[in-house]
Amino acid sequence: DIINALQPGKKGRSFRQVVMIDYPRPGLKTIGFVTNELDIQEGSNTEGYISVYLPNPPNPTSGFLVLVPRSDVHVIDMSVEEGLKLVLSGGIVTSGLLKCKV
């Protein structure tokens, strides 16, 4: 499944959107890819989360998964293919402006 996820345009499970989150601390931005959405219940409280895969450049098959509250995820206005190029190039291949969708 990870190989399919890294091939934009393939049918089935794949990265859905390019997003930006504060990671590893507030103020530092990290590019990731939405893999799923889920709810987490703690006691009587249920909150919506987004599964975000954070690839390690230059090898995107190495990375890790974080579950981020929906309110902390910012969707970037770019295709998954453009996002992969950005990550694989270490940030070299970019237009110089990342626009978040409102």
Task: Name these PLM-found stretches.
Residues D1-N4, P8-K10:
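Transmembrane alpha-helices and immediately adjacent membrane-cytoplasm interface residues
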Residues S14-V102:
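Terminal membrane-proximal soluble interaction domains of membrane-associated proteins
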